[in-house]
Amino acid sequence: MASEKPQDLMVTCTAPVNIAVIKYWGKRDEALILPINSSLSVTLHQDQLKTTTTAAISKDFTEDRIWLNGREEDVGQPRLQACLREIRRLARKRRSTGDGDALPLSLGYKVHVASVNNFPTAAGLASSAAGYACLAYTLARVYGVEGDLSEVARRGSGSACRSLYGGFVEWQMGEQADGKDSIARQIAPEWHWPQLRVLILVVSAEKKPTGSTVGMQTSVATSTLLKFRAESIVPERMKEMTRCIQEQDFQAFAQLTMKDSNQFHATCLDTFPPISYLNDTSRRIIQLVHRFNAHHGQTKVAYTFDAGPNAVIFTLEDTVAEFVAAVRHSFPPAANGDKFLKGLQVAPVLLSDELKTSLATEPSPGGVQYIIATQVGPGPQVLDDPHHHLLGPDGLPQRDL
């Protein structure tokens, strides 16, 4: 753990994106970020999608500062401040209990943070979850805080607590008013279902018009469907989804994933005024998935959409190549044919004429910008090599950030 030696007061970590298959939408406490229902997610592999964060503390720093993707941001942002306060509170608490490893001097030091995503920020790719999980995890190592970090990460972004673990993760809504029991826990490790694959169909990398925070507040205030969903639908779905994962029941997993995505977006439409995160391409992808499955006479592919138009596709290893070919057929790459597929290697295959007929889609060139092929992955990692630091010895971002 970090000590008072200057070189030990800089830590760099990475954290993953997670994709909910049972959705979180709506808070019962805005300040503590406590959800109106439990949720369940899949952690994606950091080889393809991750946030990298460096945090440094020094007696020479005069103020807290943060840089995101190379640009300095307002460190006074309320959720960022909530994370910093919570970590420092835990560090003080640890010190007051007489823990010999707690940092005696550094609690008063200011912190500099630099963070970068290797994927589009604020485009419905769960960037805030990875970002705040990485912040919490990195700050914990700098300040010598151990134990569960759900509360710290949750203060930044609710779903961030799910990115603190790899594999398949449940965020329990909890019952206590102070949120102490609203925590994330792993229900299966990343190696549990090795055949499972994930494809992210990037429809738009633009910032979404209605942010998640505002969207949730409006839905909680106006949607009766959301209340019914949280109280009467989600509890049973959490049990069923856990069973599907533990038993590797892909058919049931896939169908429930799609139904829950559809119901989440139905609550957005039930919100007043209505919110629509999906666009025409999103709806064409939904149609493509159902036609692909109908052709095969079984559910081989599932979609889910968060608060944005990008599709996340779940399938098994033996179906990836054919479905990627179906996407290429339906959404021919506009100009970047050789860069259309990123991430894991996928062998090209030819679609059968029968499948082309079943898809029956009018090609929509450029509708899908690119595909990221990935799989289930581990939780946050510490990067021990100092060459990975995003901050220089002076505590300022490295020039090549």
Curated annotation (Swiss-Prot):
Assigned keywords, A-Z = Acetylation, ATP-binding, Cholesterol biosynthesis, Cholesterol metabolism, Cytoplasm, Lipid biosynthesis, Lipid metabolism, Lyase, Nucleotide-binding, Steroid biosynthesis, Steroid metabolism, Sterol biosynthesis, Sterol metabolism
Q: List the GO terms this entry assigns under cellular component, sorted alphabetically.
A: cytosol; peroxisomal matrix; peroxisome
Report the record's Gene Ontology biological process terms: cholesterol biosynthetic process; isopentenyl diphosphate biosynthetic process, mevalonate pathway; isoprenoid biosynthetic process; positive regulation of cell population proliferation; response to xenobiotic stimulus
Q: Which Pfam families has this protein been placed in?
A: MDD_C, MVD-like_N
List the catalysed reactions. Answer: (R)-5-diphosphomevalonate + ATP = isopentenyl diphosphate + ADP + phosphate + CO2
- Region feature (Disordered): 382-401
Sites binding (R)-5-diphosphomevalonate sit at 24-27, 79, 157-162, 213
Which pathway, metabolic or otherwise, does it act in? Steroid biosynthesis; cholesterol biosynthesis
Q: Name one GO molecular function term.
A: Hsp70 protein binding
The EC number(s) given in the record are 4.1.1.33
**Sites of the modification N-acetylalanine?**
2
| Subcellular localization | Cytoplasm
Q: What class of enzyme is it?
A: lyase
Function, as annotated: Catalyzes the ATP dependent decarboxylation of (R)-5-diphosphomevalonate to form isopentenyl diphosphate (IPP). Functions in the mevalonate (MVA) pathway leading to isopentenyl diphosphate (IPP), a key precursor for the biosynthesis of isoprenoids and sterol synthesis.
The record describes its quaternary structure and partners as: Homodimer.
| Stated family | Belongs to the diphosphomevalonate decarboxylase family.
Q: What is this protein called?
A: Diphosphomevalonate decarboxylase
Q: Tell me the organism.
A: Rattus norvegicus (Rat)
Traced from the root, the source organism's taxonomic lineage reads: Eukaryota, Metazoa, Chordata, Craniata, Vertebrata
